[in-house]
Design a protein with these regions (language model features):
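A conserved acidic beta->alpha catalytic loop
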Residues: 107-115, 131-133, 165
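Short aromatic/hydrophobic "clamp" motif used to bind/position activated sugar donors
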Residues: 158
């Protein structure tokens, strides 16, 4: 390899298949390549750190089941008549004694049969959110639903899940045993997407699984805040000590991560990750590209509200790396610098390989290794959606359960 100077600046020729390609390093594409290589290098180091973090999270084995911890399960529900029965049936089959847990379904202004379905289960108390709030429009009905549930609960430990989820039989028993043993204030637990063979569902399952692996590693290593409201547990004491959702109640989403950060600030040693197959909550995928983008835009909308600067740094790194990887092939084709595409493919290959190294043990834990064949094929689409969802999460709006939110 030889470097020289040309009219456009430094030229780096690359020999490939008997052709000599020259890329002006100080051209737009050359600068983007340098930035992308730098960002990708940092990203790979971070993923290796996550990989080590995942490996050292202990697999929790429930040796002595505890049936004395008082638990309240809070389920916010809006128009969930199709999904709610499966969740409540799975809760009905818990090995944990019903004497020690309470189930509250908070009906968030449903226009379907959600409330009637919930009321058919004798162990469920259904509360109507409209009985507890005024007629004023809110920006976060879900936080208000959870807050209402907590105010009407009796449990020492609050457990939250979503109405479109299914929980395993030993879910509560394992949570109670872990809580009894370690006395955490906030417990983060695994969630998996229950997908079919449809490409959009496989894509979601892979994307979500990567987030779950990062969640476990970051929580255990105390690198930054990350969790999912479909499977959380926290003490009533901690929720009340941080004054609940006060200060974040005007933000549309964030009933999970924003609350986690508030509790972590007051109880830095009280945040634990419960890694056990007994507590993997299965959640339903969305069934269209439009619904998927809408969901991810909703998730991205809270990004600039995080007080945790560490997660902000990670999000910026990932977002701008994907922006660079999207711009490089576009600019190379526009400018006619076809050789840059070879570098782009190399960057994609490195990114994909490092991500697969990280994902393999995570997929093993979630019993989703057969899905990994699709991961390289999904890479370009993942880059595109990350850029779109990140931008619209900041500057656009989204629809949630028939409500338009900005």
């Amino acid at each position: 390899m030889v470097a020289g100077c040309g009219a456009m600046g430094i030229i780096v020729p690359v020999y490939c298949r008997a052709h000599l390609y020259c890329i002006p390093l100080f051209s737009m594409t050359g600068i983007l390549l340098i930035i992308s290589i730098s960002l990708l290098s940092i990203y790979c180091v971070l993923l290796i750190y996550y990989c080590v973090g995942w490996a050292v999270v202990p697999n929790y084995a429930m040796l002595n089941p505890q049936h004395t911890v008082s638990i309240t399960i809070i389920i916010p529900a809006r128009n969930e008549e199709k999904n709610l029965p499966a969740l409540l049936d799975s809760i009905d089959h818990q090995t944990y004694s019903k004497e020690f847990f309470q189930v509250l379904v908070i009906d968030d202004h449903s226009t379907d049969n959600t409330a009637n379905i919930a009321s058919q289960y004798p162990f469920v108390t259904c509360l109507s959110l409209k009985d507890f709030i005024g007629s004023d429009s809110l920006n976060s009905y879900k936080k208000k639903a959870i807050e209402t549930g907590i105010k009407n609960s009796v449990g020492e430990l609050i457990v939250t899940t979503d109405a479109d989820c299914i929980v395993p039989a030993k879910w509560l028993a394992t949570i109670a045993a872990f809580y009894h043993q370690y006395k955490p204030e906030f417990m983060v637990m695994p969630v998996a997407i229950n997908c079919t063979a449809k490409p959009i569902e496989i894509f979601q399952a892979l994307d979500f699984m990567s987030l779950q692996g990062i969640t476990a590693a970051s929580v255990h290593k105390k690198l930054h805040s990350m969790c999912n409201g479909a499977n959380l547990a926290y003490t009533r004491k901690a929720f009340e000590a941080v004054d609940g959702f006060t200060g974040i109640d005007t933000i549309a989403s964030g009933d999970d991560m924003l609350l986690m950060h508030k509790i972590a600030q007051q109880y830095p040693a009280g945040i634990h990750y419960l890694k056990s197959k007994n507590v993997i909550v299965q959640t339903a995928p969305v069934h269209s590209i439009a619904a998927f983008l809408n969901q991810r835009i909703r998730w991205a909308s809270k990004a600039d509200k995080y007080d945790d600067k560490r997660i902000m740094a990670v999000l910026f790194l990932v977002y701008f790396l994907n922006v660079m990887l999207l711009l490089i092939p576009v600019l190379s084709l526009v400018s006619g610098q076809w050789s840059v595409v070879l570098y782009w493919l190399l960057l994609l290959a490195v990114k994909t390989i490092v991500e697969l190294i990280f994902l393999f043990p995570v997929a093993t834990f979630f019993h989703k290794r057969p899905l990994l064949w699709a991961f390289p094929l999904a890479q370009p689409f993942h880059i595109l959606y990350t850029v779109i969802a990140g931008w619209l999460g900041k500057f656009g709006s989204y629809n949630w359960k028939g409500r338009n939110v900005k």
